[in-house]
């Protein structure tokens, strides 16, 4: 997997409109995106993921998935399913409504790679700083 560091993708207009209509009071995922979105950038992971090859999923997006997964006490399979079917997760992750998401096996590989490089606390520490 290669990476070109960036921030979270912008929330697509249609995704935002549907999320706001379906959840007028918001949700945990929407609140995290709106108030803490700047924490979930690729930059802290720049040394862990290469720049060659086809781009992989954004480490910033995967770290946001991991935080939402923990907050909602979900398995990897359930978290990957939420990215496909839950409008508030699509909003938080900056996904189009028709986006088919990612395979659940990406999540344990992502966590293992962070642990391999001593970055398992990187997102948590950034959340505390924010």
Annotated model-derived regions:
Residues 24-67, 71:
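Basic, short loop/linker segments at the boundary and entry of helix-turn-helix/winged-helix-like folds
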Residues 96-130:
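Active-site- or DNA-interface-adjacent structural scaffold in DNA-acting proteins
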Residues 65, 79, 83, 103-107:
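Short, conserved catalytic/metal-binding motifs centered on acidic residues
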Residues 1-37:
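Charged, often Cys/His-bearing segments associated with DNA-binding zinc-finger transcription factors
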Residues 87-98:
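Short, basic interhelical loop/turn and adjoining N-cap
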């Amino acid at each position: 997997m290669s990476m070109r560091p960036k921030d979270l993708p912008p929330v697509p207009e249609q995704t935002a409109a549907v999320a706001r209509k379906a959840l007028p009071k918001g949700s945990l995922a929407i609140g995290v995106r709106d108030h803490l979105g700047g924490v979930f950038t690729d930059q802290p992971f720049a040394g862990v993921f290469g720049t060659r090859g086809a781009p992989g999923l954004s480490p910033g997006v995967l770290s946001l998935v991991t935080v939402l997964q923990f907050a909602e006490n979900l398995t990897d399979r359930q978290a990957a399913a939420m990215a496909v079917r839950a409008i508030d997760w699509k909003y938080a992750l900056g996904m189009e409504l028709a986006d088919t998401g990612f395979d659940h096996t990406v999540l344990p590989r992502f966590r293992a790679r962070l642990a391999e490089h001593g970055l398992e606390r990187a997102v948590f520490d950034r959340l505390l700083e924010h």
